[in-house]
């Protein structure tokens, strides 16, 4: 009776084709590997060669055989002591092997081989990524064991072998879920930097700073957040070590020389929880570019509909990203009434404070050609070296010294970071957009900041006593000749080679240009220096203005009064600075503070005889 049961059960049971089984799983593995192979070539185009498919498939097949053999050996070794062959499995596999190979084996050998094939099939299915095929194989085993009289024992025997598969599939689903969560939607910027936590300097050996290499990623997150800043340590790590939402950043600024005396290209991030990160870039351009990008993502101004609200928010952000300019803070503390500037075809309303320098505000971009045409139609710029008496020369120099701040492309003591933000507002589309500002580090010099293919470049300008402009190895008779030249000829970059960068347009300084009127020596006396009229240009206070004499005098009187050192209201000689140069930030700060207190003290000897410290080499910095 016991011997007849297996034979009667084996007759109706369908015998699966092992070749079809192998072909099915081979197709699944091949399709999965082909998809991943194509994705790999898209991510790494250097491997995209005509024979890449052959090389990859051969390597895949060789490794597949090695891993397959090892996995079979491992599964058989772990399951040999726990699993015993069932009579039904023995009979079915015996019929399968007899029909396939035609060998005559004993029932014990066939049962052992059937258990091996069962484990091999399960082990092979675990290597595939398709869960539907795994479920299909499971249904196949259930159908084979269903005709057995004691079929309740067969599923129990198959459970220990299916548990590892279920655990593996659960891990596979979990890994896919995590990968979907960390998928990036919009990467703003990515680069390799070095960073340290501010507290690590004291905790390191001997109080030294603990710098770490990282991959800094500025991205937009998935779940409705705006932006995040992530530190990947080491740079090749797949998950960030530190992840900071930009809404938690309260301050972004470049470091001062006293803070990091041994490092030049560093900036600071301060977070709401009190953490402070110091990051180091390769050069100064990357430093200011990172600061500008982070600030732009912290509070993008284009999301504000109300201009007044945008200006107010920009004022808060300007205090966060304050540069090392002491004049910036002093001037920001002085309240100024808002003014409305009406230009040709454009109306811009903004307060006079430094909050206008934020990227979010809509600043007018004026074509340089329009300015040059206006300049030519007005007869050009008056020469400063006309013959005349000394008093007339001094008055002409004083008038010319105010001219640079009167032009719309000059932004006074605008910081390097804010200048970069202005020219980078349109990204690569604003190629050729420029501003001219006063140098933060070299008194008496100016800097041409322009947009070069979406990156901010800073070119130093030097103005001599005759108004001539020196840019790298080129000399120009005036700043206007320099603008006219670089409007039609490419700017020679320090990196060499041909660069298609010409000055196309400029960011117009927000402030009404002064109305043409009498020269400063014929203006009505004002009570103190640096007290400007209501309609004066915003940046005119950044140039050097002198107090008019107490009583009107002619040119000779002006000459004699300029030679007298006892008069506090006389015009001080400035042999070391040109008529078109802008003065240092520290000097202008002193005058601002004096104006606030209402004092009119005599200029010190150091102020009168300030000389240029270094003969400049004109390059990007």
From Swiss-Prot:
The keyword 4Fe-4S does not apply. Pfam families: PH, Phe_ZIP, SH2. GO terms for cellular component: actin filament; cytoplasm; cytosol; plasma membrane; ruffle; stress fiber. The modification Phosphoserine is found at residues 130, 303, 597. PROSITE patterns: PH_DOMAIN, SH2. Residues 143-166, 507-528, 549-611 are annotated as: Disordered. Gene3D superfamilies: 6.10.140.110, Pleckstrin-homology domain (PH domain)/Phosphotyrosine-binding domain (PTB), SH2 domain. GO terms for biological process: actin cytoskeleton organization; B cell receptor signaling pathway; B-1 B cell homeostasis; brown fat cell differentiation; cytokine-mediated signaling pathway; D-glucose import; establishment of localization in cell; glucose homeostasis. Keywords: Cell membrane, Cytoplasm, Membrane, Phosphoprotein, SH2 domain. The modification Phosphotyrosine is found at residues 47, 618. Adapter protein for several members of the tyrosine kinase receptor family. Involved in multiple signaling pathways. May be involved in coupling from immunoreceptor to Ras signaling. Acts as a negative regulator of cytokine signaling in collaboration with CBL. Binds to EPOR and suppresses EPO-induced STAT5 activation, possibly through a masking effect on STAT5 docking sites in EPOR. Suppresses PDGF-induced mitogenesis. May induce cytoskeletal reorganization via interaction with VAV3. This is SH2B adapter protein 2. The gene is Sh2b2.
